[in-house]
Curated annotation (Swiss-Prot):
Fe cation 2 binds at E97, H172. GO terms for molecular function: cation binding; metal ion binding. Coiled coil: none annotated. GO terms for cellular component: mitochondrion. It comes from Schizosaccharomyces pombe (strain 972 / ATCC 24843). Pfam families: Hemerythrin (PF01814). InterPro entries: Hemerythrin-like. This is Uncharacterized hemerythrin-like protein C869.06c. Disulfide bonds: none annotated. Transmembrane segments: none annotated. Fe cation 1 binds at H34, E97.
């Protein structure tokens, strides 16, 4: 195991219902992504060599970049649509938290696993991300689910998964974080990111 830092980030794991893809609610889709990100983080921390750490770094960046933009395009507009003024405040709060995470991810994605500040940068990023995850899983997403029919929730989950296929796979903190401008910016950035992905190493 690579010994960069002894800092531990507390990861909270909330249960995800085991449903088929066609019957996944939006909360299940989002929480499943959160579990993947926590797993990627732990795999980086437990890597026995720099090559393995780099592969999981690429996976973590790929997952987090797509997840963040997917939420901003599909989920946060629904906060504003269904949850009134509180929903608007939630959306702005979450966008602000995403922006901070994107800026940290932008720095982390260009770092090398053998740099002395590689793991400290990851820990700082994960600490902020975990706080955001806790808020979404304990309050924001359950609150939204209460205002959605099952059909609406299933449709949102499908849109969320579909959107992630077309968005950038690396962090672009200077890009817009609201649709439709974020959608347009993503369509331009995504092809370049996907070419970059072809040159990366993966788990």
């Amino acid at each position: 195991m690579l010994q960069y830092s002894k800092k531990k980030v507390s990861l909270n794991f909330f249960p995800v219902r085991l449903l088929s893809y066609k019957m996944t609610r939006i909360s299940d889709a989002i929480f499943k992504d959160h579990r993947k990100l926590q797993s990627d983080y732990q795999n980086i921390k437990s890597a026995n060599d720099y090559d393995t750490a780099t592969r999981w770094q690429n996976q973590f960046v790929w997952e987090l970049a797509r997840h963040s933009v997917g939420e901003e395009i599909v989920v946060y507009p629904k906060f504003e649509k269904y949850l009134g003024e509180e929903g608007k405040e939630m959306a702005e709060k979450d966008r602000h938290e995403h922006q901070l995470v994107k800026e940290m991810l932008y720095k982390f994605q260009s770092m090398k696993a053998n740099q002395s500040n590689f793991i400290p940068a990851l820990d700082e990023l994960m600490e902020s991300l975990q706080k955001h995850i806790d808020e979404e899983e304990q309050h924001d997403i359950p609150f939204l689910e209460k205002h959605l029919s099952e059909e609406e929730s299933l449709h949102m989950a499908s849109s969320f998964e579909r959107t992630k296929k077309f968005v950038p796979t690396h962090s672009h903190p200077s890009a817009p974080n609201k649709p439709p401008f974020e959608t347009v910016a993503g369509l331009f950035a995504a092809p370049i990111d996907k070419l970059r992905d072809m040159m990366e190493k993966w788990p």
